Regions:
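Long, charge-rich low-complexity segments
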Residues: 91-110, 182-195
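Acidic/His metal-coordination segments adjacent to aromatic residues that form catalytic metal sites
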Residues: 2-3, 80-92, 121-130
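Amphipathic, well-packed alpha-helical segments that form the structural scaffold of globular domains
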Residues: 22, 26, 105, 109-112
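Short, contiguous alpha-helical
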Residues: 7, 11-25, 30-78, 119-186, ...
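Helix-adjacent hinge/juxtasegments
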Residues: 67-105
Length: 195
């Protein structure tokens, strides 16, 4: 009974993080979803591609349930699972993610939390579905957080889900940012702290 509750809870949280990640693409042009937004080249559509590949591998291959399509190379020298070629469309990548999630969902539904798996690239490769599900949830949530920050840097939009988004008060945000900046400068002695 507790296993069913735990599985349902983890799966629901995973679905929320998946939705948040994909939502970060909404309303952006092709350039903004693809361009590198960090010094390491992190980009919004690449995060979705990376998570699609991760779900297909961790909640597919690891449990002897290979994804039925070819997958991008995994952690290769050029990071091909982290960025999108000019020939790959937004729709293709989002559809790939949805198919990978559906495949992963079947694994979650059909296997018990103590189902054994094998992650050959981990130091302790013998795993259970519970541990892998926690890992996938953690990784998806982390990347959804990356996407949230990247999106905020592009157009100021923040939040977890579209239905919870509130219009931005740009004046209040600017005032808050100025206070934080002033405090940071005061901390290093560059300006006196305001009280």
């Amino acid at each position: 009974m507790i296993d069913d509750f735990a599985k349902d809870c983890l799966h629901e949280e995973l679905n929320d993080s998946r939705a948040a990640l994909v939502w970060k693409l909404d309303g952006l042009c092709e350039y903004d979803i693809r361009r590198p937004l960090t010094v390491t080249g992190t980009n919004l559509l690449g995060l979705v591609k990376h998570r699609a590949t991760g779900e297909a591998r961790y909640l597919g291959e690891v449990f002897g349930r290979p994804f039925p399509e070819p997958l991008p190379r995994w952690q290769d020298a050029d990071g091909s699972d982290h960025w999108v070629t000019a020939a790959e469309t937004r729709e293709q990548i989002v559809d790939f993610y949805r198919r990978a999630c559906a495949h992963a969902d079947a694994t979650i539904r059909e296997l018990p939390l103590d189902a054994p798996g094998h992650v050959p690239w981990w130091p302790r490769p013998h795993v259970k579905l519970f541990g892998v599900l926690v890992h996938v949830l953690q990784d998806t949530t982390r990347h959804a957080g990356h996407a949230d920050i990247l999106r905020e840097g592009l157009d100021g939009r923040t939040g977890v889900l579209a239905e919870q988004e509130r219009p931005a008060d740009t004046a209040a945000r600017a005032a808050h940012r100025a206070v934080v900046e002033q405090t940071a400068l005061a901390a290093i002695g560059a300006v006196p702290e305001r009280r």
